[in-house]
Structures are given as structure tokens and as C-alpha cells.
């Protein structure tokens, strides 16, 4: 199924901002970015992005996915069972993605549980 996103700005991630362009997505992949005129006759799903900007997914190179903002995160983790830590980390991963961050580099948590979270997210 193809979806055309159009109406707002398109930022390409290397410094260019485009007006009057559309972004065509087939399934999970971007298949085209072009002036809106190139999409005349498109009959698939259309999403109006007016008053918005489409941009590539962001990368956060310093996260601790198992932490949830506690004042003393290491002590807090010691009170939790591994299953609770993994559930919290999965929730944090989902929040991260919903905020536009599509890639992270985790710098450690507890008992390497972040690797289980990585594997679950990648499956």
C-alpha cells in the first residue's frame, strides 16, 4: 500500500528544505521524494502534512534505555526485578520512537538487559 505525504515542508537531513514536495511511502520504505506535480493522479492514501515538516529519523548517541529519569537511577534499578527493568526499557524505547528518534546507542544499564530489549525491538 502506498501513502503520499504532502502539504508541509520536507527536510532532507543534509540542509535542504523543500516546499511543494511530496514523500511517497510504499509499505515501510520511502520510494520517492519529488515536486507535487510528479504525483498527479496518485490514487492511494494521502496524508496532509500542512503546518508540519517531514524529516529523517533522529539518532540519539547517548541513552540508558533502562533508566526512567529517577534522581538516583542505579539505586532504583537495584530495587527492580529484571522483568520490571525490561518492561520499563521497552516503554522507554516506544516513547523514544514516538518522539522521532529512530536509532539509539545505549551506554549501559544493568545485567546487559538492554541487549534483550534491542533484540525484542529488532524482531
Regions found by a protein language model. Give the residues of each.
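N-terminal metal-binding scaffold of metallo-dependent hydrolase/deaminase domains
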Residues: 1-41, 54
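Short amphipathic alpha-helical surface micro-motifs
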Residues: 5-6, 27-30, 49, 110-117
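Short, well-ordered alpha-helix to beta-strand connector turns
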Residues: 7, 43-45, 101
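A generic local structural motif
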Residues: 9-11, 34-35, 46, 90-92, ...
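Short, well-ordered secondary-structure micro-motifs within conserved domains or adaptor modules
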Residues: 44-49, 53
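Metal-associated gating/positioning segment near the N- to mid-region
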Residues: 53-120
Amino acid at each position: 500500500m502506498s501513502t503520499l505525504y504532502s502539504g508541509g515542508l520536507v527536510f532532507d537531513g543534509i540542509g535542504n528544505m523543500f516546499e511543494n514536495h511530496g514523500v511517497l511511502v510504499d509499505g515501510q520504505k520511502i520510494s520517492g521524494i519529488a515536486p507535487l506535480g510528479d504525483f498527479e493522479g496518485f490514487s492511494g492514501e494521502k496524508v496532509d502534512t500542512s503546518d508540519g515538516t517531514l524529516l529523517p529519523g533522529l539518532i540519539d548517541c547517548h541513552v540508558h534505555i533502562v533508566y526512567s529519569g529517577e534522581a538516583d537511577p542505579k539505586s532504583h534499578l537495584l530495587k527492580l526485578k529484571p522483568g520490571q527493568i525490561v518492561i520499563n526499557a521497552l516503554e522507554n524505547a516506544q516513547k523514544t520512537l514516538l518522539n522521532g528518534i529512530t536509532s539509539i546507542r545505549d551506554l549501559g544499564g544493568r545485567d546487559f538487559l538492554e541487549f534483550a530489549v534491542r533484540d525484542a525491538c529488532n524482531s
